[in-house]
Amino acid sequence: MTNIWWVRRDLRLTDNAALQVALEAGPVVPVFILDPAFSGSSLRRKDFLYEGLHAFDRDLRARGSYLVIRKGNTVQALGELLWETDSETIYSEEDFTPYAIKRDEEVARHLSLNLIHGQTAHHPNSILKANGTPYIVYTPYSKAWKANLPSRLTPAPAPEKIDTPVRIRSEPLPRYKVSPLFPSGEQEALTRLDEFLHRQIFSYSEDRNRMDLEGTSTLSPYLHFGMLGLRQAIHAARQAMIQARGEMPKRSAEVWLNELIWREFYIQILFHFPHVSQTAFNASLANIEWINDESQFEAWKAGRTGVPIVDAAMRQLREIGWMHNRARMIVASYLVKDLLIDWRWGEAWFMENLLDGDLAANNSGWQWTAGTGTDAAPYFRIFNPVLQSIKFDPNGNYIRRWVPELRQLDSKVIHAPWEHGLKAKGYPDRPLVERDKERTLLAYQQSKQRMERV
């Protein structure tokens, strides 16, 4: 009996549990539905997905299959495909975002949908405290996560052949514009993983925060769309820990593994507490009186704040759809703590522009910096962007790359040219605001006091 393999955020053939189960049941029809909900994403992000669909189709055709494209209402599109192919069951990888859960519940009310766990190493319901409630602090969660991880987590290889009925009606694959810095698809993801394992992973703990170095994996867009499975990355990290020569390389590989666990931690937070997608996890900080100056927000988005490290990061985002993780923390702290602009404004801008715009990771990252989330940075921790710049871009090379107006400045002054009385043509003379830590702390403390009175 032919079955439908409904592909969503699992654009890979390697270690795809939903595909494996579907193939055991018989021939499969791989289908991707162009969801109207994705229409609000940036053109760059759409291009990354669409290029990934082309690459996925090529990988399928190399195995005797092909990707069917449908668009419109999900229930209607899947129902029509079931009827056209005389299929009975839809197999798909389980997704844990509030939107995906609601969508899948609607499909399951009308059609036979079999959701297969494969997006994470542990299902969000499987790692719980002794009293049956979810963890909200990372450290005990990570300990339980590691304790319950199988000793062997070898990824399943891609199938050599996929049997698919011929001549099934399909919409044309969407056109796309190639990104030279982030080519899309599973093969590119595997290549990047291999390069990372042979180069940066063993110095990851020292280099990962340096914005001027290529010290990170840059795998986040591929993990988001499932071109690389999280289980594959976890297996690679564990293998690197085994193969590492010396304590420091081993520690670096473990630090990367911990970052992957953070990703899974945030997925389960969103799963158990879906309200965080709309408001603060910490209710006592849900009523901060933000200033929300729109002109300052526009300057932040455009990379025109007058703070070089902030502007470099925001221009990197606009130009390539990606930003170094340390830079994300710096620009988020500046928006929320220095400009007193609602973290949700920044979160939405990131989701619109990031190739790796992942609701769980993005929301939790913003709430961590704002101090409003679970296991977040204390609300009174306020990054000094100049000190962050000096520490993590010591020679100013990251700034020079993305803020060409400052390219000629010496490394000693490039981080804060206004402090040295320097001006650069076409660049703001001074930052948008003078740093006022007391103003920020007062806004947060007043929110806590209002909640205490309630």
What is each residue range found by the language model?
Residues 74-88, 108-116, 160-173, 373-380, ...:
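Short secondary-structure transition/capping segments
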Residues 45, 49, 302, 306, ...:
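Residue-level preference for long, well-ordered alpha-helices that form the structural scaffold
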Residues 43-47, 180-187, 300, 389:
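Charge-dense, low-complexity intrinsically disordered segments
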Residues 132-280, 284, 392-393, 397-454:
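Glycine/tryptophan-enriched, flexible segments
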Residues 215-405:
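Active-site-proximal binding-pocket segments
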